Amino acid sequence: MSHHKKRVYPQAQYQIAEGIAQPIVGGGVPPQTVGAGQPQFLTPAQQHLHQQIDQASNGIGNMQLHNVPVVDPTAFQQAGTPVQQPPYGGAPQYGQPMNSGYGADNISGVQQQYQQPMQQPYGQTYGQQQQQPQYQQPGVGMAVGKPMNQLYPVDLFQELPPPITDLSLPPPPLMLPPEKMIVPNDTVNNCSDHLRCTLNAVPKNNSLLKKSKLPLAMVIRPYTKLTDSECPVPTSEDGVVVRCRRCRAYLNPFVQVIENGLRWRCNFCNLANNFPQAIDMNGNRYERPEFNHSVVDFVAPKEYAVRPPPPSTYAFILDVSQASIKNGLLATAARTLLESLDTIPNHDERTRISIICVDQSLHYFRIPLDEEGDNIKMYDVADLDEPFLPSPTGLLVPLIEARSNIEKLLTSLPEIFQQNIQPRFALASALKSALNLIRAQGGKIIVVGATLANVGEGTLHKRNEKAVANTSKEASTLLNTGDAFYKSFPIECNKYQVTVDMFMASDDYVDIASISNLGRFTGGQTHFYPGFSALNLIDVTKFSKEFSKHVSMDLSLEAVMRARGSSGLKMTGFYGHFFNRSSDLCALATVPRDQSYVFEIGIDEQLTKDFVYIQIALLLTSNAAQRRIRVITIGIPTTDKLTEVYASADQLAITAYFAQKAVERAPSSGFEDTREFFNKSVQEVLATYKKEVLTSNTGGGAPLMLCSNLRMWPLLMHSLTKHMAFRSGIVPADHRAQALNNLETLPLPYLIQNIYPTVYSLHDMPDEAGLPDEETGEIVLPQPINSTSSLLERYGLYLIDTGLDMFLWIGGDAVPELVTDVFGTPDIMEIPIGKNELPLLDATEFNLRVRNVITKIREHDDVIFYKTLHIVRGASPSEPMNHPSAREVASLRLWTASQLVEDKVQNSWNYREFLQNMKTRISK
């Protein structure tokens, strides 16, 4: 603990309404209704079910604490009356500045709105009660003998501001009784990090699904860490892989053991299968991972491989054109790759590397093995139409055997091309050459470029953005592929098990919409660094950290992913970065560890059983030269009641589904149509809920009702209309295309944060925030606040986390003490704005705490993103009009304001207006 004195910064403290009503979170079973009207459970397995339900009930009770603010009544006085704060650590209290436009008598309209909660446009506060229409009571219509999630309706207007802590709650539980498991335990049917279903109670027929207006889909994330050593899943290593003879489903915790353990009945197709004798060779079969876990890895026997496991192979294509030399990208990439050689996956010591440099010609390097000397030769190939390999050997070399010479080459690359003034970049020819080089093994082609592909096959051209910006033709003109090569080449890559990853860093147009297809259909990814300059340490840090983590993530090759559903279910749609090889098979040349996928499910016949099952199987070759199968299996109850469908809906997974559908339709339908797609989807659900779930027909003056487990979903859908990918207004084409690309691949937690940014109030954060927890040692983060300007004080300090970037907003009327403690200068006009880092100030603990919060937010081992910090200065009446940074500051303020998604962005509604519009629509 630092010896520095703590400070207190100005903040408003007011009385709020008493008698706060705690909303109830949906997706659980209240204790008072468990087993109501049901027979007593007597068997041990059924007793275990009681315990499971009790735990779920207790969890729901605990969740309630997160849905309302915890308020100390003694900390508030009369509403609207500022009070003196207690001393903070003995330090002198910072007074509020009383200059014009900021004093108590001259406060801004936004601040007045925040200081008077009883007059908020969001309607009644939590303490106020309102007569509500009748609705289905919890427990009504429950299936006898089968516990289900229950419905807890809420008024969305009463839930304003929306309780954002709901975004971190788990989904409604999968209510599967223990007798449906071979070995009941907590690791069976508990894999929401890997697999989430939009509906945790599946409608028994397609008509009920259509009636609900909710989608049935899965959000899949096969790997949750970048490396296998982090959180490994249970593994069956004896080579015994048991599958159903008919449907080919894998043995899982939900099969039925029959005939005294000699056979098992498949839970997908109901076929009886024999157990192989080998299943008992290593002891008790019921201790095997596949009986005890929903997520399990199998080391596959040789029958699962069509050829010996190939070595991990990387072909790096480096842009050496004038733009790449000028902005320092080549030097940065070469240095980063050099520093990452130790972390490139090489578990079996067979990893191979090739380096090709490109401008208007192709520059190959023949790298000798270290034992053969250090004479590295460069071959220049100018034939772009039919590029050829200039040497039969030495172009693709083992990392471990040519390490010294690879280091020598990477060190010398910037010097070799430092005088290059060629403006052209033959991307397509380089890609074809790299594919020709590694086609025998498969692997990855990683492109680092700073220039639009402008010569040879696959030439792209700048598009006239100004002519179509913010018009109905914008999407079709700017987002469609500019050349057919970028759709045909990925097909060739899939034939040879090759993935393409793109790292584009430029301050000019590079046509992300076209080149992103290279990764989209090969299981790869496109990363974009607009305005990159090696002279800016912030740019270098972001690129280096992300590029290094990308090449260091474990590499899995020759992968195929298949989804199975039990009788009556079929896969109808697939979304994500892969090649859809057949109706239910997705091919990934390599498996990315930081992406997720969405599979849509259809109901093609009446579901007659009480439970259905879904299984994801991913067959791949690991970097350790093992053929492995990752199997993920869950069981889901079925229902013929619409109330139970709604009570079990997962609002985050549903949002991911609609985001994928919107990404798919935007290029052809346009952005206005896509925004209306979000609005209409919410309207249909609210209308269905009002008509089919509420037991009385209510008039236009009634509340806007929805179940509590879906109460954040309208906010997320509304926020999507303001996302850079879909919003109206002028958005650069490359930025919009990259935003669509991110929505298509982000893992669910990062997707939600990218849709609804997390906002932290730092100037008034609790004493423990920003310091290590006494028990865990982890840095404590302050509680987030709603993403709205109505909560931002003009003298405050706020951090906005979008999942990809961070914005540190300092109010224009912040007192000099706060500015000094954070930035080391009392003059707010001297704060460095834009991409930057906070200075290290030894004289103030508050600076350390803020830096700790930023560092903690940047910590993650499941994606490669490094969040750039943008420092933004708020407006102030004393700000000079002709300040040199005025234009940059105005742009930063607009960008920051666009992250406050509960407010108006461009011509969109704020959230309350959106709900009012929905209410009007469904009342017609």
Curated annotation (Swiss-Prot):
GO CC annotations?
Answer: COPII vesicle coat; endoplasmic reticulum exit site; endoplasmic reticulum membrane; Golgi membrane
Localization terms from the record: Cytoplasm; Cytoplasmic vesicle, COPII-coated vesicle membrane; Endoplasmic reticulum membrane; Golgi apparatus membrane
Q: Which cysteines are disulphide-bonded? A: none
- What molecular function does GO assign, one term? zinc ion binding
A GO BP entry is: intracellular protein transport
Specify where the region named Zinc finger-like lies, as residue ranges: 244-269
* Pfam annotation, one family: Sec23_BS
Membrane topology, as annotated = Peripheral membrane protein
Query: Any idea which positions bind Zn(2+)?
Result: 244, 247, 266, 269
Q: Which SUPFAM superfamilies match?
A: beta-sandwich domain of Sec23/24, C-terminal, gelsolin-like domain of Sec23/24, Helical domain of Sec23/24, vWA-like, Zn-finger domain of Sec23/24
* UniProt keywords, alphabetically: Cytoplasm, Cytoplasmic vesicle, Endoplasmic reticulum, ER-Golgi transport, Golgi apparatus, Membrane, Metal-binding, Protein transport, Transport, Zinc
What's this protein's function?
Component of the coat protein complex II (COPII) which promotes the formation of transport vesicles from the endoplasmic reticulum (ER). The coat has two main functions, the physical deformation of the endoplasmic reticulum membrane into vesicles and the selection of cargo molecules.
Q: Which family does it belong to?
A: Belongs to the SEC23/SEC24 family. SEC24 subfamily.
- Kindly state the subunit structure of this protein: The COPII coat is composed of at least 5 proteins: the SEC23/24 complex, the SEC13/31 complex, and the protein SAR1. Golgi apparatus membrane; Peripheral membrane protein; Cytoplasmic side.
Protein name (record): Protein transport protein SEC24
Tell me the classification of the organism that encodes this protein. Eukaryota, Fungi, Dikarya, Ascomycota, Saccharomycotina
Protein encoded by which gene:
SEC24
